[in-house]
Amino acid sequence: MTRYALITGASSGIGLALAEALARRGRSLILVARQRDQLESIAIELTQRFGVEVLFRACDLGEPLRLSGFLLELEEGERQIDLLVNCAGMGTSGPFLAQDWMTEQDLIEVNILALTRLCHALGNSMALQGGGQILNVASVAAFQPGPWMSTYYASKAYVLHFSEGLREELRSCGITVSVLCPGPTRTAFFGTAQMDTAKLERQQLMSPEEVA
């Protein structure tokens, strides 16, 4: 039976770089992100370049009902997933009290709740299969508070500590849990979070490929 690596946030940045790195190693992939057109183009390109099977699913992980539907599709499809890469994430910047609450809620849904739910659903599947791997993408932001990005920094601290705890819990099931904590990386994140990109350009940013 074909084994798949499932990658969220796979349409750009670190998620895309990890997808390419895994395809280069011959891994079959399931790519998840919001942008269907981008995913389709990426799937075609990776298949042509590396000769691997690449499936994709457009899904907004910030919407619990859509995530439920996606998880049901995975269960009914009976595809064996032995690697989960939780790379989807978002950020906001500015005074917390000035933020739009729905945007803050979306951040919590994507960065915390969707990641946790995917770990629970696919972790159970991996345990039944006899093992697997989970990679959760956090950030160096996980190690310190972040005024004017308080929710984002807190969400990454959650990912770090959740992953560290889960690593101990799932060790006996043959499941390896790792957490990636990259520094500032040249992705679309900063623009989406409405950060001062001119200031960031003066810093030494890593490329997504270097992180992957």
Positions of the model-derived regions?
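Conserved glycine-rich cofactor-binding loop
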Residues: 11-13
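Conserved glycine-rich Rossmann-like NAD(P)H-binding loop of the short-chain dehydrogenase/reductase
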Residues: 25-42
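Conserved NAD(P)H cofactor-binding loop of Rossmann-fold oxidoreductase domains
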Residues: 87-92
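Substrate-binding pocket helix/loop in short-chain dehydrogenase/reductase
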Residues: 95-108
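Active-site helix of classical SDR
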Residues: 119, 155
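Residue(s) in the substrate-gating loop at a strand-loop-helix junction
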Residues: 139
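SDR active-site lid
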Residues: 167-212
